[in-house]
Amino acid sequence: MTCTILVGGQWGDEGKGKCITYFCTQDKPEIIARAGVGPNAGHSVEFNGEKYGLRLTPSGFFNKEARLLIGAGVLVNPEVFEHELEYLSKYAVEGRTFMDANCAIITDKHTKQDKDSAYLSKKIGTTGSGCGPANADRINRTIDYAKDVPELEKYITDVPSEINKAIDEGKDVFIEGSQGFGLSLYYGTYPYVTSKDTCASTAAADVGVGPTKVDEVIVIFKSYITRVGEGPFPTEISPEEAEKMGIEEYGVVTGRKRRVGLFDKDFAKRSCMINGATQIALTCIDRLYPECAKVNKYEDLSQEARDYIEDIEENVGVPITIISTGPDLADTIDLRNEKLN
């Protein structure tokens, strides 16, 4: 039984939703915990032919046996939280979705400040979700916590106690981060970053898990890179080149068109170093090599695709254990047994 953390290795939009869905289907963790900044990041999840866009609820919600927890490090907008409970009602998330008492609360004041700031909205490219101003208030110790909001009382639990008890009992725990390494307040392309760190160590702290309790850190990369908003992007290609490659993507929260670039092995190596990666999940290989769409055996990938994957693995120095070849759960090559045992 393991405690696993999954975080993004680039600038977000790496395909965390699909991979989390896969892990939570295959491994069936008893607890799925949400770490990260807050509702400024969207996870796209496809399950049973339906697509969901989530901003707070853990992406493994479809596993009806799992408890879904939101760690104290995560900012909560009660309106977004309530909306997602209703939105996902067919999966019986009510009664098994809880947040820590110390989650800080985003209010209309914070979202207004975010949207009204020309610096944040135009220069930095904020999503307008209120996370930056809310984290500023948190640092100044002027923000309300979930325990201060009567309407949230029935959703409050002691997240660190629940998770650590589960780990001590030998149960599987899955912790999902949000956004990506390049957006880290500490290690990203400052000032074009989010309002806190996005690395695996912070994800563990967000939910109250000490570093010695973590068994696996999976860093997820897209086979190419995308970025929403402003900021340095060394391997960026022109929209015309991206169009020739057949790549056109839009952000889940903002709807803004994503910038596109080539895979950056040096950036990936640094991302894996700082995150302490034990595994890599690589997504969207089918976008670069369309002949690999829906392949679920490594030997059935084209030689060109295999060479591409093996070159990344050799240069980054971390085993690539999961390869996504399409949006469906079946479109996955799982090499964990071969590479980790």
Curated annotation (Swiss-Prot):
GO terms for molecular function: adenylosuccinate synthase activity; GTP binding; magnesium ion binding. It comes from the Archaea. It is an enzyme of class 6 (ligase). IMP binds at residues 13-16, 40-43, 127, 141, 179, 194, 256. It catalyses: IMP + L-aspartate + GTP = N(6)-(1,2-dicarboxyethyl)-AMP + GDP + phosphate + 2 H(+). The keyword Disulfide bond does not apply. This is Adenylosuccinate synthetase. It comes from Methanosphaera stadtmanae (strain ATCC 43021 / DSM 3091 / JCM 11832 / MCB-3).
